[in-house]
Amino acid sequence: MKRAFIMVLDSFGIGATEDAERFGDVGADTLGHIAEACAKGEADHGRKGPLNLPNLTRLGLAKAHEGSTGFIPAGMDGNAEVIGAYAWAHEMSSGKDTPSGHWEIAGVPVLFEWGYFSDHENSFPQELLDKLVERANLPGYLGNCHSSGTVILDQLGEEHMKTGKPIFYTSADSVFQIACHEETFGLDKLYELCEIAREELTNGGYNIGRVIARPFIGDKAGNFQRTGNRHDLAVEPPAPTVLQKLVDEKHGQVVSVGKIADIYANCGITKKVKATGLDALFDATIKEMKEAGDNTIVFTNFVDFDSSWGHRRDVAGYAAGLELFDRRLPELMSLLRDDDILILTADHGCDPTWTGTDHTREHIPVLVYGPKVKPGSLGHRETFADIGQTLAKYFGTSDMEYGKAMF
């Protein structure tokens, strides 16, 4: 029986890549800088002391970081027994965004350039805005700028509630984000607006990767909170991913937990399970692992590392999240059967000590564990697509165009 379980710790980079200079990210190191802050006692909010990740360390995380950067992260045990196979992987794709990272993991790197809205003020073309106002019958719009999602709610949330004007904003990523109040504006109405925006961006040739619905609740600045009803409308991958091949060629099953289905525009996904927060995502993953049959992938994205702690530059929160993940990891490992493989990885970096609020161009960890997986180093991987090629070989699908099987 062939089953693979892929866990993406969204944004969990392990050191800047060779091309980081192109992105302004030389020296970025999500894991290394979190560990350093913990070791110095600078991340003692809601947790305390050196970064404590014994289970990830046993799977080779510290060694993978050493391969990427040349050193073991502060406070982590470089001499611990390693029971898994580990690697550090470079991104072939042109960007450092979520779709690029995930698609490349599934064997389809993004070799074209995404479109971006690079102006920090008046970010969107007037023609696009006019079409959205007309088609969605809007009273206007707010924002039209680059912003952090939580900051813009404090700035414009109250005005949005009074006027009914949606908040449009973007970032350094290829995204068009729309924030609206779940109750005063309405969740269905927000989703409909995002569908219209997706159509207009596609028809207009803007080449924007995602439209993201950002619903929130609350009644005044300071207590607005984004909810778990985020929805991403992505373009489809430019070629069949290993997920699609498993479904088409092997009549397999691919279970999305969290936002995976959105990232792949539902391509190659046979079941979607929604969950919000680390514990809920873990619980849903465990349930699906227990029910998984032959030729099945259970694919989970743990988004909180990125959205709650990476972008918000919350070192202590990120550290606490990693420690929670590590504590629960044995629950996943104990469910593995003889031929199963568990892959822990990431899609990009988002160093919470870095300037700004954007992603960072970093190597990702590739930690592979299973009863029949030989422990030890799998070395430096030139593309995340090595994961996809490894899965293609494992399940016996046709080869992916990119990547080399790791074993």
Swiss-Prot record:
Where is it located?
Cytoplasm
Q: Which cysteines are joined by disulfide bonds?
A: none
Question: Which residues of the sequence carry a binding annotation for Mn(2+) 1?
Answer: D10, D347, H348
A single cellular component GO annotation? cytosol
Which cofactors are reported in the record for this sequence? Mn(2+)
Signal peptide range in chain numbering: none
- Gene3D superfamilies reported for this sequence: Alkaline Phosphatase, subunit A, Phosphopentomutase
What does the cofactor field's note say? Binds 2 manganese ions.
One Gene Ontology molecular-function label = manganese ion binding
Q: What is its EC number?
A: 5.4.2.7
> Which InterPro entries does the UniProt entry name for this protein?
Alkaline_phosphatase_core_sf, DeoB, Metalloenzyme, Phosphopentomutase_DeoB_cap_sf
Q: In which pathway does it act?
A: Carbohydrate degradation; 2-deoxy-D-ribose 1-phosphate degradation; D-glyceraldehyde 3-phosphate and acetaldehyde from 2-deoxy-alpha-D-ribose 1-phosphate: step 1/2
Give the UniProt keywords, A-Z: Cytoplasm, Isomerase, Manganese, Metal-binding
Q: What does this protein do?
A: Isomerase that catalyzes the conversion of deoxy-ribose 1-phosphate (dRib-1-P) and ribose 1-phosphate (Rib-1-P) to deoxy-ribose 5-phosphate (dRib-5-P) and ribose 5-phosphate (Rib-5-P), respectively.
Q: Which family does it belong to?
A: Belongs to the phosphopentomutase family.
Q: What is this protein called?
A: Phosphopentomutase
Question: What's the gene?
Answer: deoB
